[in-house]
């Protein structure tokens, strides 16, 4: 473990003698910053300065004062999982009495309810269930597309893809091709957490490695899909590890252009094996969002994470580099299992975006704007968030 930590530090050796102002000026002027620069930004306590730089960079990508959002639902189709992450309160071991696999008809009903209120995206994720074979996933996707041809299936994280490949003794490329052919449209970036082995070995020893997570995303692009990049902080990781995470995401984007968006949030340790860890603050979250926007000069869209941070902090993040409010998320079970529950429907989303001084616009998963809302205009049919 000591050797792993030292290896991460070696990657940012050389440091930087630049001041915070000089680093930010370079970034705002379109120059790339280094991992050493990122570490120096993490060491800074000048949150306002970081936020202003990130906001300036965001406006270069998105000059209009529009904040987008998508109407969608998180469907957790199974909680059986043999990865046993120490920070997860949602999973149950295989064959546990409290585990489940949702019936197809239940999933279909959830999707119908989503479309009935103007929803366009289904984020379907679950545990790494060793009892589910590839045909479970392909048959489910085909059934969904037969009934709901217009719904966008943004589903199955890299860890789930690797589990299917393991169960079937197939390559992840072959698995992804079969899923894409059956109706999978894009891949969410769940399970990235921190892309360094020292942290992953400490908190999720059985989970896919950083390289495997990146390979899944690159392969998804190869077979005709795209994905999102994510980052979770609060595991006790070093600033150097955070910088290395960002570097690996930036490198993958340079190589393949596989990411449409970046989303970060804080570890929610309640009810988990990491409950003794000190929970990070909203300021830590906003700093990470800002530094990520400053560093990741090749990803256009940054989502706010109101699900973990709450609507008010989510609103504030729109001035720290985020141009998107994420999904309204009719249903969410994983974060709420860790005793963190925030509920935001479509009309509250519109209100929060307007309070931030922005114009709300509904988008699809490809970040194409479907509808821009005028002042005081609301959705015709809304929902109550379910858990």
Residue map of PLM features:
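Catalytic cores of alpha/beta
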Residues: 171-175, 236-248, 309-319
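Auxiliary Fe-S-binding modules of radical SAM enzymes
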Residues: 7-9, 13-48, 115, 247, ...
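Active-site beta-loop-alpha junctions enriched in small/polar residues
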Residues: 74-76, 127-129, 156-163, 191-193, ...
């Amino acid at each position: 473990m000591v050797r792993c930590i030292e290896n991460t530090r070696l990657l940012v050796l050389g440091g930087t003698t630049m001041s915070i102002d000089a680093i930010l000026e370079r970034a705002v002027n379109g120059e790339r910053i280094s991992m050493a620069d990122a570490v120096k930004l993490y060491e800074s306590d000048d949150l306002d300065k970081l936020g202003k730089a990130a906001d300036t960079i965001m406006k270069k990508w998105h000059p209009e004062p529009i904040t987008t959002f998508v109407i969608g639902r998180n469907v957790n189709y199974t909680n059986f999982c043999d990865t046993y992450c120490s920070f997860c309160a949602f999973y149950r071991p295989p064959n546990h009495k409290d585990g489940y696999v949702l019936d197809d008809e239940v999933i279909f009903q959830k999707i119908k309810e989503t479309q009935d209120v103007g929803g366009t995206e289904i984020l379907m994720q679950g545990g790494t269930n060793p009892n589910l074979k590839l045909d479970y996933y392909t048959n489910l996707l085909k059934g969904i597309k037969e009934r709901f041809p217009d719904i966008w299936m943004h589903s199955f994280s890299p860890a789930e893809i690797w589990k299917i490949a393991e169960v079937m003794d197939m390559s992840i490329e072959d698995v992804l091709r079969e899923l894409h052919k059956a109706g999978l449209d894009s891949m969410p970036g769940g399970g990235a957490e921190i892309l360094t082995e020292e942290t992953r070995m400490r908190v999720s020893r059985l989970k896919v490695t950083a390289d495997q997570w990146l390979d899944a995303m690159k392969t998804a692009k190869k077979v005709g899909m795209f994905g999102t990049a994510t980052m979770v902080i609060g595991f006790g990781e070093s600033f150097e590890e955070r910088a290395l995470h960002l570097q690996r995401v930036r490198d993958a984007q340079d190589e393949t252009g596989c990411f449409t968006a970046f989303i970060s949030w804080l570890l929610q340790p309640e009810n988990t094996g990491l409950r003794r860890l000190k929970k990070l603050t909203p300021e830590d979250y906003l700093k990470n969002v800002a530094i990520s926007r400053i560093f990741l000069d090749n990803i256009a869209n940054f989502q706010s994470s109101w699900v973990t941070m709450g609507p008010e902090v989510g609103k504030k993040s729109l001035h720290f580099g985020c141009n998107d409010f994420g999904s309204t998320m009719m249903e969410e079970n994983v974060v709420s299992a860790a005793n963190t529950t925030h509920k935001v429907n479509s009309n509250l989303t519109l209100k929060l975006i307007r309070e931030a001084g922005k114009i709300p616009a509904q988008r699809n998963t490809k970040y194409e704007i479907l509808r821009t809302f005028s002042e005081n205009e609301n959705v015709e049919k809304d929902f109550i968030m379910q858990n």
